[in-house]
């Protein structure tokens, strides 16, 4: 069996992703998007909204778009940085060429493409679960070692979650009172989002630091579920858990040997997180707003992001827009609130989603052409 086949669904005619699942995800995504914008725009003066969007300052619009692109490109740069570092240790033993057509693709640009592909599939799947498997597929297809690709993607994902949790906890500790006042009825959702992210980080850290303990706990949980007739006995579940813990353990071993790489990834991830929060402030300035500090706008946007990050909705659509409209109502003037949401959300999600769709389509065409 080829390496790439070990990390992706079995191929079928028309693509490696099951077509029915693909159609269902698309319908769900478009349905939620339609309901979201219908709810938000119903009863609004569309001509005024259009005029406000049209009057957005071009320099600030470019700056906001640049921050959106930086968000995705930063992940690609981390993939490239880690993958290149891991390949250096194997170059003396074997040379692995990653080729699409006749060009090497283990470059910064190729890794940025992986990031756009991951963003697209994460955006159209519930809880952003579809991105990494597809990234892994293309990385393996390019000739990267499956073990290296897995460690790189897991490291990026873990640091992403850890930085998000640290930011969320820091905001709660130092700005808890202000958050509760500003978020009002959405404050419990913020606490839920932070709690869910914390649980994920705790589970992942346990898998990395105490893999045997995790396996024992899982075996006990599985036994209870089988006893209650919730699950049927299936040895493949334990195999998946052992693979899961083994992969994270490999990531830990590699990071222990390269602590400097870990520091770089943490720093870049922090900047990546802040870029998407700062984007909203660029929109705020671009719409001619004043009176609210950059710290407050960034804090509010970060709270929205943390609250919806783990919700099982494609792209966290619907709840993100509704929470934004409520939280930023005191910040933007009445005529600028909806336009600001359309611009900021349009740039940090839909614009990147379209870019990711374009990159994905181009890569899909190239893969089919090679086959």
Which residues fall in each region the model found?
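Anchoring transmembrane alpha helix of integral membrane proteins
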Residues: 16-88, 92, 102-105
């Amino acid at each position: 069996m080829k390496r790439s086949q070990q990390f992706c669904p079995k191929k079928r005619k028309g693509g490696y992703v099951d077509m029915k699942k693909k159609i269902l995800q698309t319908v769900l995504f478009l349905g939620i998007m339609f309901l979201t914008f219908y709810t938000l725009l119903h009863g609004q003066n569309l001509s005024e909204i259009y005029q406000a969007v049209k009057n957005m300052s071009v320099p600030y619009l470019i700056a906001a778009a640049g921050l959106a692109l930086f968000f995705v490109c930063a992940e690609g740069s981390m993939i490239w940085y880690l993958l290149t570092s891991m390949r250096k240790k194997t170059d003396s033993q074997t040379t692995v060429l990653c080729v699409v057509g006749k060009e090497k693709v283990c470059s910064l640009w190729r890794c940025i493409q992986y990031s756009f592909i991951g963003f697209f599939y994460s955006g159209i799947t519930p809880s952003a679960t579809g991105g990494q498997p597809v990234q892994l597929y293309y990385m393996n297809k390019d000739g990267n070692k499956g073990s290296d690709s897995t460690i790189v993607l897991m490291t990026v994902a873990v640091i992403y979650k850890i930085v998000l949790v640290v930011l969320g906890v820091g905001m709660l500790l130092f700005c808890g009172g202000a958050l509760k006042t500003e978020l009002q009825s959405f404050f419990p959702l913020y606490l839920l989002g932070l709690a869910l992210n914390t649980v994920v980080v705790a589970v992942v850290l346990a898998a990395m630091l105490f893999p045997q303990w995790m396996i024992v706990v899982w075996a006990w949980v599985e036994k209870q579920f089988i006893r209650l007739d919730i699950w049927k006995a299936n040895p493949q579940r334990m195999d998946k858990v052992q693979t899961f813990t083994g992969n994270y353990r490999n990531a830990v071993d590699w990071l222990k040997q390269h602590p400097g790489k870990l520091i770089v990834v943490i720093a870049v991830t922090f900047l990546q997180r802040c870029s998407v929060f700062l984007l909203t402030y660029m929109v705020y300035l671009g719409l001619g707003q004043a009176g609210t500090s950059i710290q407050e706008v960034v804090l509010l946007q970060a709270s929205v992001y943390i609250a919806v990050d783990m919700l099982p909705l494609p792209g966290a659509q619907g709840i993100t827009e509704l929470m934004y409209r409520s939280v930023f109502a005191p910040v933007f003037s009445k005529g600028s609130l909806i336009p600001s949401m359309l611009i900021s959300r349009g740039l940090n999600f839909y614009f990147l989603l379209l870019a990711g769709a374009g990159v994905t389509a181009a890569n899909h065409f190239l893969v089919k052409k090679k086959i």
